[in-house]
Amino acid sequence: MTEKKEQDMLRKSLLVLLMCLISAYAFAAKDKNEIQVKGSDTMVNLGQGWAEKYMEKNPNAFIAVTGGGSGTGLSSLISGTCDIAMSSRNIKEKEIALANKKGINPNEIKAGLDGLAVVVSPANPVSKLTVSQLGLIFSGKILNWKEVGGKDEKIVLLSREVNSGTHVYFKEHVLRKNDPNGKEEFAPGALLLSSSQAIADEVAGNSAAIGYYGMGYVSSKQKPLAIAKDEKSEYIEPTIDNVLNGKYPISRPLFLYTNGLPQGLVKKFVDFVLSKEGQDIVLATDFVPINR
């Protein structure tokens, strides 16, 4: 046998051995008492709160929670790299079709409710806007704060990135006013930021900025605006009670997605999320529990 053939056989043997080791590792990892939860940046603090409490009660379990956006979480579920996707929007038809092609059956679980707060700096005199005014501002048709009762100052638009469920929801429900044929887009000059916290930090330091995110991120460094459906409607502040009673016009459900009906540790974790203890964590993180 030539030296070249011996080297080829050695390479093939090593390749087979490597594949066996990878398969064995994957099988062993699957049997571990751990799950990966990924997705909505709005929900990441909530998800970590659930995970920490669950692991405190179940020391042998490991729940890893990361953000990245609703689209990122759903893509990970579809590709099989996470067990639970967190999403602040419904899964899209094209995502379901792609999942089905890959043998994934997305199962939707409503885990809480959220109000989208529209925030400005506390130094900004504007305290209320209509949904229509918001649409005009974020699409770039209203450019100066003086047009809505504020200072003579150019508006600085802050938005989440396009893979964010918060971005998608705001565009569909505020810019396009729930019109399935709507074509309105965010103004080209809008700054697309990677997280809700990034928007919160920017608003806190910029008196001309306006942004939006889940109301759980609001602090004393930002001022949430009261929002009205139209000029004839009451202006409503983004509070838990106003989301729960349906008065606040920019509210939405928060979802978990699993591959088929939850099983094993995934089911135990989801059951915990939906329990009174899990829903108390929803309330403690300034979201609205589904069973309140």
Predicted region positions:
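Alpha-helical transmembrane segments of integral membrane proteins
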Residues: R11, L15, I155-V156
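Hydrophobic h-region of N-terminal signal peptides that target proteins for export
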Residues: M19-F27
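Positively charged n-region of N-terminal signal peptides that target proteins for export
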Residues: T2-S13
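Extended rod-forming repeat segments used as scaffolds/tethers
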Residues: L18-M19, Q48
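Exported/periplasmic ABC-transporter solute-binding proteins
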Residues: F27-R292
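Transmembrane alpha-helix boundary/anchor motif
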Residues: L14-L15, L21, E277
